[in-house]
Amino acid sequence: LENFKAQQAEILAAKNAHPLIFIAGFFLTYVTITGLSIPGAAIMTLIAGALFGLVIGIVVVSFASTIGATLAFLGSRYVLRDWVQSKFGERLKAIDDGLAKDGAFYLFTLRLIPVFPFFVINLLMGLTRIRTWTFFWVSQLGMLAGTIVYVNAGTQISQVESTAGLLSPTLIGSFVLLALFPWAARGLLAVVNSRRGQ
């Protein structure tokens, strides 16, 4: 943890020296990771909270993750369609059925509670008829709650000064929130779906 804090201090110094360039570099890195479906988005989100704080971290991650997801979506639709079809085609029927039944709300539920991995959703949605703009704004809205939870956890990690800090009520609360979020989201969606069915 001490090594992490030492590295964090150096990174923060670089950020403070050239804040706009640093944020732009982080943003492009996040977009690239997401667009190429490389694992690490969750860690990058925590780091964003540690480096930029809650508000800026949320803004950076929200747009970077959505733009990256949309690039993956477009790549699947126009470049990698055959490969995605052969790799994940067995899951496509569930996506098509969900969109046929609930439209864009189905994508919203997948973003809120991912039944499929994040990158698989991006790729498979590219094979559907959903419009690019709809994919973009629904994805951004659906991922926002999770982004807030993860960035908030990152802000707490940045404040840990020693191993004892790992047991601080605030940090523990942040990770409890991370664990409870999918269950809370599932309950909320159940209520929404029940009202929609009335």
Outline where the language-model segments fall.
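Transmembrane alpha-helical segments of integral membrane proteins
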Residues: 147-160
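Helix-capping/transition residues at the boundaries of transmembrane alpha-helices
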Residues: 45, 49, 76, 125-127, ...
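Pore-lining and gate-forming transmembrane alpha-helices of multi-pass membrane transport proteins
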Residues: 138-143, 166, 170-178
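Alpha-helical transmembrane segments of multipass membrane proteins
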Residues: 33, 68, 72, 146, ...
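Transmembrane helix boundary and interhelical junction motifs in multipass membrane proteins
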Residues: 30-59, 115-122, 146-149
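Membrane-interfacial helix-loop-helix
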Residues: 1-26, 62, 66-122, 127-133, ...
